[in-house]
Amino acid sequence: MKRYSQVAGFILAGGASSRMGRDKGLLDFGGVPLILHTARLLEPIVAGVTIVGSPSKYAKLGLRAIADDARAPDGPDRPGRGPLAGIAAALTATHSRWNLIVACDLPYLSAKWLDWLLSRALGSRGEAVIPRTERGIEPLAAVYRRECGAAIADALARGVRKVSDAIEELRVDLVYPREWRQIEPSELLLKNMNAPGDYEEARNWCAAARLSANDHVRKPRPAPKRKRQSAVRRRK
């Protein structure tokens, strides 16, 4: 699989996870925290992976992290700025022209699909390359040019909170299902994990996928067929 040395990877650690009741990034997924699983998925294909979240929280996992200084604490007077602030922080910190930005709660992402998305983005004239599903756009599994940072920071300063509203000012190249599903047809690919039921479903899927992979590895190969010896010996 190709490594895109001109692309930086960022994982948005997420907010308070009020519906989950726990930090989604630290939930066990296949024996490791979900955010570490996601980092390992990105590491082989990008120049480096950075978490946008609390540096002290993720340092113990060996992950580089930057604080999202633009995020305000939740409250009636200062509502949280959500993932838009995380995207702004990533694009402010980056030195790479292209940046793969994903949320930490997308357990079904595949390396094959991310590799394809990056290849697709590097040939695009858009400022952001964003997949779309039947539910709408998926800006938290997308590729952004560094120059998008200024427009997104400006949107934050004006009080914009929805990512979908902020990117209206960008030149967006939408990737429709008919295109990306040729690479990864799974309906689960871009499904995020918000509630305990979603987490249980993702864990079951992960366990089944690992079991299937192990069975494939352990499956014995058929013994090679022996050549039949001729019943008639050559006469001297």
Q: Which residues make up each language-model segment?
A:
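Nucleotide and nucleotide-moiety/phosphate-recognizing core
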Residues: 2-189, 200-211
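Short, basic, low-complexity termini and linkers enriched in Ser/Thr/Gly/Pro
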Residues: 1-2, 212-236
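Conserved active-site and cofactor/substrate-binding residues in soluble primary-metabolism enzymes
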Residues: 197
